[in-house]
């Protein structure tokens, strides 16, 4: 896959492309797409017996504070195969830091054209509370047994703050490349 040919989205920061690396419900394996070759690589095996609560990947042509593309989770009716691109609407951000610093996780839903189930969802608050709690719990604990690694959740950012996080990540990418 030539990542340079995949747009940020149709209408960033409100309609984005997410490149999925790990399917929703996926086994405790951390996959990452190699940014140079486009190949799906095993980054590591999670030391905890946990599964990913949402389809997980990144937004192309973005650069987060940690030097990687912006992370994104896309909740949906089914797992999405790794390497697939899904159009989505951001609805919030899980504010998180890990041992290396800021590591926000943008939360999104599929655009209505793909599935109308999330039409009325405009904020992370519109999702079932148990789902947002499961997402926060996963990211609070998925590194627990890895030596030298840690995470801390500080809460959720609303859609407006999320749009600004995405704009900043796009700007940072454009200034770096």
UniProtKB/Swiss-Prot annotation:
One Pfam family per UniProt: Pyrophosphatase
Subcellular location: Cytoplasm
Sample GO molecular function, one term: magnesium ion binding
Magnesium is among the record's keywords: yes
CDD domains linked to this entry: pyrophosphatase
Key words, A-Z: Cytoplasm, Hydrolase, Magnesium, Metal-binding
Binding positions (substrate): 30, 44, 56, 142
One BP term from GO: phosphate-containing compound metabolic process
Cofactors, names only: Mg(2+)
EC numbers for this chain: 3.6.1.1
SS bonds (residue pairs): none
Binding site for Mg(2+) 1: 66, 71, 103
GO cellular component: cytoplasm
UniProt catalytic activity: diphosphate + H2O = 2 phosphate + H(+)
Chain residues that bind Mg(2+) 2: 71
PANTHER family: INORGANIC PYROPHOSPHATASE
Family, similarity comment: Belongs to the PPase family.
HAMAP family linked to this entry: Inorganic_PPase
Function: Catalyzes the hydrolysis of inorganic pyrophosphate (PPi) forming two phosphate ions.
Subunit structure: Homohexamer.
Protein name (Swiss-Prot/TrEMBL): Inorganic pyrophosphatase
Protein species of origin: Caulobacter vibrioides (strain ATCC 19089 / CIP 103742 / CB 15) (Caulobacter crescentus)
Organism taxonomic ancestry: Bacteria, Pseudomonadati, Pseudomonadota, Alphaproteobacteria, Caulobacterales
Gene expressing this chain: ppa
């Amino acid at each position: 896959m030539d990542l340079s040919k995949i747009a940020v989205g149709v209408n960033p920061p409100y309609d984005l492309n997410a490149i999925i690396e790990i399917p929703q419900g996926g086994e405790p394996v951390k996959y990452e797409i190699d940014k140079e070759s486009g190949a799906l690589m095993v980054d590591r095996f999670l030391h905890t017996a946990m599964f990913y609560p949402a389809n997980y990947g990144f937004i192309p042509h973005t650069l987060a504070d940690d030097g990687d593309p912006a992370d994104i989770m896309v909740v949906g009716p089914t797992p999405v195969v790794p390497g697939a691109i899904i159009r989505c609407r951001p609805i919030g951000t899980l504010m998180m830091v890990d041992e290396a610093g800021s590591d926000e996780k943008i939360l999104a839903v599929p655009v209505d054209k793909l599935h109308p189930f999330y039409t009325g969802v405009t904020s992370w608050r519109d999702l079932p509370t148990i789902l947002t709690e499961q997402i926060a719990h996963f990211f609070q604990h998925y590194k627990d047994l890895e030596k030298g690694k840690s995470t801390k959740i500080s809460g959720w950012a609303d859609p407006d703050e999320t749009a600004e996080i995405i704009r900043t990540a796009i700007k940072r990418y454009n200034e770096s490349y």
